[in-house]
Amino acid sequence: LLQIHDFPEDGRPDRYRFMARNLAGDGGRLAATLYPLAPHVHYAPLNARDRHFLEQAGALRDRVHRLPNAVASLGASPDAAPQGAERILLYVTRAIRRKNLGEILLWAAMEDAARFQVSRAPRNPAARPVYKRWVAVAESLKLPVEFEVGERDDLPLGELISRAAALITTSVAEGFGLAFLEPWLAGRPLVGRDLPEVTEGLKESGLDLSALYEALRVPVEWFDERMLRTKLTLGYVEMLEAYGREPSSDLP
């Protein structure tokens, strides 16, 4: 039984190149090394998205089994009512780039009657510059956002959750999706961004995520469409190059 978590093909080109070079000699042989196919080999991915990946890559459906993570309590009483007069929306996260802090700032600019809190800063030095940029933007615009509230010794996480009216997520990428489950154990609703490829299995199990949205649509008139297409194309080509792949000839 192989429990696959954090595929190197999924946005980790440095790991992919390292493994291709040291395990298989090249990318062509790496797949056979990492993902063997045989009657006695079964896979246990965390979510429906990864299950689909494995099945589309050739694994037989009856040899792929979704194995969810256990979910631990965040330390808050599910029966506790929100404390204080303010409406607080708490983002329980370590604010690395994929946690998408810019969207929290957008909500803070739009929602006058709420205060937003982000629990922790990133530990990785490489993630600090982007994080600090968003902190600076929030300060310059005087947005109602507090950062690193979970780093304070006088306020444990359970207390922060007890003070919050709801928990929020704006992440653009998750593994198992603990962020979609933990709020309910803490007795708090969850608002923010849905990731259907991650939450599909959770919804099938009966979890109500109807308060989440899948996209924030922006009018085309707000930006230069040609510039956006150029940036998307360049980003796509850079990702291909990072994996040692050639771009297709039909790119705009």
For the regions a protein language model found, what residue spans apply to each?
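A short hydrophobic beta-strand element within the catalytic core of glycosyltransferases
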Residues: L167-I168
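Nucleotide-activated donor-binding/catalytic signature segment of Leloir-type glycosyltransferases, i.e.
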Residues: Y131-E159, S205-D224
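Conserved donor-binding/catalytic core segment of Leloir-type glycosyltransferases
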Residues: A44, A80-K99, L105-A108, Q117
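Carbohydrate-associated surface elements
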Residues: R49, A70
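Aromatic "clamp/platform" in nucleotide-sugar-dependent glycosyltransferases that forms part
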Residues: V172
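A conserved nucleotide-sugar
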Residues: L101, A108-E148
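Membrane-proximal helix-turn-helix segments that form the acceptor-binding/catalytic region
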Residues: P8, F18-Y43
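Catalytic binding pocket for nucleotide-activated donors in carbohydrate/polymer assembly enzymes
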Residues: F176-F180, W184-P252
